[in-house]
Amino acid sequence: AASDVYKRQLDEEKDEINEGLNPAISDAIDLEIAELRMYQEQAKSIVNETKAKQLLVALEKTFHKNEILGAPKKALIFTESRKTQEYLKSFLQNNGYQGKVVCFNGSNNDDDSKSIYRKWLSLYAGSKRISGRTIIDRKQALVDHFRTDAEIMIATESGAEGINLQFCSLLVNYDMPWNPQRIEQRIGRCHRYGQKFDVVVVNFVNQLNYADCRVYELLNEKFNLFEGVFGSSDEVLGSLESGVDFEKKLNHIYQTCRTEREIEAAFNQLQSELEEIIQQRIKDTK
């Protein structure tokens, strides 16, 4: 096999390199290579991703509740990358949602999206619904397909800008952004004029990562993004100069803090700074 040939070549090159090395260094390199190969095999053995399986559980529970309330069986899932989007589409289609998933991104140029667009053009041929602008019409075709045929839309940030999905009352942040303004914009895709049900927001947070938990705590408790009335966070979000600045501060914590104590101290400092800024801005606007 090609992999066996590659392995033999690698071993031969390694032997040539090791000839001029101190035996202790050579042994250390061999140990590191063995460790890397072990990680490689472990990665290959991963078949079912825990996070994706938990998504199935969340969808099942929330769809069941929506059915009781009379809400549509619709879910908008946000991811940070096209790669994750493609993976989730395949995973969901292989686990009970075949033909019920539509992707929405910056290009909408995959085969399924093209097929949906062609059917949409045929359906509305000669009507004013077709604007003649391909990008806009293709987006509208996917939104219409989500409304009438699909149950799940997997969207990236750039793709979902400006679309109205008030017929969907379940939003899943599969990948959580650090920018609080981006989170509110996501929720705003569903929570807008014409929405007849409370919008349920499901957030995926790695509970084993202390920094991730503190980020969620800030977003939830200081920015009021996930509880209470939509729009109640406007005053708080308005106190920020830029959500990007907030992201930069979080990124600095992730890059520089290693221990839980360091993370705790850094987040306490950031929280204190935010409280001062928020209170001052609210005071200035009164």
Language-model-derived ranges and their functions:
Residues 179-197, 201:
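Conserved SF2 helicase motif VI
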Residues 197-286:
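C-terminal accessory region of SF2 helicases/translocases
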